[in-house]
Amino acid sequence: GLVSSIGRALGGLLADVVKSKQPA
């Protein structure tokens, strides 16, 4: 559903931010 899509998008964005902060 829409909520699922939004959650997935936010999760991906959050993961990108975490990856950027963590050298790996």
Swiss-Prot record:
Domain of life: Eukaryota
GO cellular component, one term: extracellular region
Keyword Aminoacyl-tRNA synthetase set for record: no
InterPro entries listed in its UniProt record: Frog_Litoria
Keywords carried by this UniProt record: Amphibian defense peptide, Secreted
Annotated transmembrane regions: none
Subcellular localization: Secreted
Function of the molecule: Inhibits the formation of NO by neuronal nitric oxide synthase.
Family, similarity comment: Belongs to the frog skin active peptide (FSAP) family. Caerin subfamily.
Protein name: Caerin-2.1
